[in-house]
């Protein structure tokens, strides 16, 4: 289309000037759009402290990892200290599943996740509690993940009937045990009574009072030692902390001041090599991987098995969050069987699981039995 000058006597250069003016107008008029598009990806207004994020988080499918496989050339579950003929060559899949959590979203970003994906939008406080921050939650999740690894090993050893012992993981500075008990000591007895797991020590200390003396039998690098400790009073900040590993009996009760972990007593060591994963929900699958590697045959029965669930040291399987997203991730990864904690079964039944079989489990023993029965074509308890 051609444009004419309003004045027939205008010089030939007039239309050119008008065209430049229009170009400038269009360019300047586009600036708000460009700025708006740029702001969509910003969490604060440039040059200010104005926060553009919304108090919501998006939860969706996370990656899955085969606990029988390798990551970057390293076994996800690495077992050492065992004879080669005891370590079973495993194959197949026992995949742990994860949930991807996205925070610090702007309103357009949140709406985009909600409209264009299968993510679930939840209040931010369900992911990052009030009076906390992302860094604190990350530390807590890392600690929970480490705890799940320890529990997975203990539960697997119990299932396999292998002996356990209690190792000192840390000694609180200034605690009654400080200077007497050392990191890596193995506590073998309390006042002459044999102990095998941290709970045995905690129970024995809990029966005493501040000021009492306790005699600990200790294996220190293969050398048998006896140490006597005068118990103190539990600090207020530990009162009611049911997850603390320290040997305590409640506020005002006897306090030793050591953090303990159970480990195999026959020299077996289990190392878990997944990085940047948090939370306790991998416990069941880690424990199954240890059982599978230390027993003949394949728990998967040649199928692609995935699952989730926390694990306690006694083998109890607990519920987790994001079950529908984990089922979806497993289905998309090609799994044919998914292990579901009993506490998640009703929610799992509503998920789009495709042709996957959802096995309901509440203990490690039960999970092993369910996989064995399913492989044989026997009836098993399923969700839904």
Regions found by a protein language model. Give the residues of each.
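Conserved PDZ fold ligand-binding element
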Residues: 177-200, 204, 219, 327-330, ...
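Hydrophobic membrane-insertion alpha-helices, especially the h-region
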Residues: 26-44
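Short, glycine/polar-rich helix-capping loops at beta-to-alpha or helix-loop-helix junctions
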Residues: 340-351
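Terminal targeting segments of Actinobacterial cell-envelope proteins
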Residues: 1-24, 115-124
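Terminal peptide-recognition signature
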Residues: 157, 177, 184-187, 191, ...
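PDZ-domain C-terminal substructure recognizer with occasional recognition of PDZ-binding tails
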Residues: 203-252, 350-374, 379-384
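PDZ/PDZ-like peptide-tail recognition elements
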Residues: 52-86, 97-101, 117-172, 235-307
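Glycine- and Gly-Pro-enriched alpha-helical subdomains that act as flexible
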Residues: 280, 293, 305, 313-338
């Amino acid at each position: 289309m051609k444009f004419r000058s309003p004045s027939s006597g205008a010089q030939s250069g007039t239309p050119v000037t008008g065209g430049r003016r229009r170009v400038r107008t269009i360019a300047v008029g586009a600036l708000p759009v460009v700025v708006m598009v740029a702001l969509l990806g910003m969490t604060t207004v440039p040059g200010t402290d104005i926060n553009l994020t919304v108090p919501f988080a998006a939860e969706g499918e996370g990656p899955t990892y085969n606990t029988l496989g390798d990551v970057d050339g390293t076994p996800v579950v690495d077992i050492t200290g065992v004879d080669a003929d005891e370590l079973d060559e495993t194959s197949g899949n026992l995949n742990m599943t994860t949930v991807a959590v996205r925070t610090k979203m702007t309103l357009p970003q949140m709406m985009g996740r909600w409209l264009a994906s299968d993510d679930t939008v939840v209040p931010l406080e369900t992911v990052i509690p009030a009076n906390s921050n992302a860094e604190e939650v990350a530390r807590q999740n890392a600690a929970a993940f480490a705890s799940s690894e320890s529990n997975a090993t203990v539960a697997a050893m119990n299932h396999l009937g292998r002996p356990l012992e209690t190792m000192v993981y840390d000694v609180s500075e200034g605690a009654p045990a400080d200077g007497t008990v050392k990191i890596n000591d193995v506590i073998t007895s309390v006042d002459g009574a044999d102990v095998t797991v941290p709970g045995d020590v905690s129970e024995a200390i809990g029966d005493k009072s501040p000021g009492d003396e306790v005699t600990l039998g200790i294996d220190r690098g293969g050398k048998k030692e006896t140490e006597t400790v005068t118990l103190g009073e539990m600090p207020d900040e530990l009162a009611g902390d049911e997850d603390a590993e320290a040997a305590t009996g409640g506020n005002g009760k006897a306090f030793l001041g050591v953090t303990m972990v159970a480990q195999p007593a026959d020299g077996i060591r289990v190392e878990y090599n997944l990085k940047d994963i948090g939370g306790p929900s991998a416990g069941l699958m880690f424990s199954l991987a240890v059982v599978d590697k230390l027993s003949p045959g394949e728990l998967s029965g040649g199928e692609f098995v995935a699952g989730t669930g926390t694990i306690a040291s006694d083998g109890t399987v607990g519920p987790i969050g994001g079950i529908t997203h984990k089922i979806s991730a497993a289905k998309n990864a090609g799994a044919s069987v998914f292990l579901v904690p009993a506490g998640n079964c009703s929610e799992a039944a509503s998920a789009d699981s495709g042709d996957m079989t959802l096995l309901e489990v509440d203990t490690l023993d039960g999970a092993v039995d369910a996989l064995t029965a399913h492989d044989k074509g026997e009836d098993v308890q399923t969700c839904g």
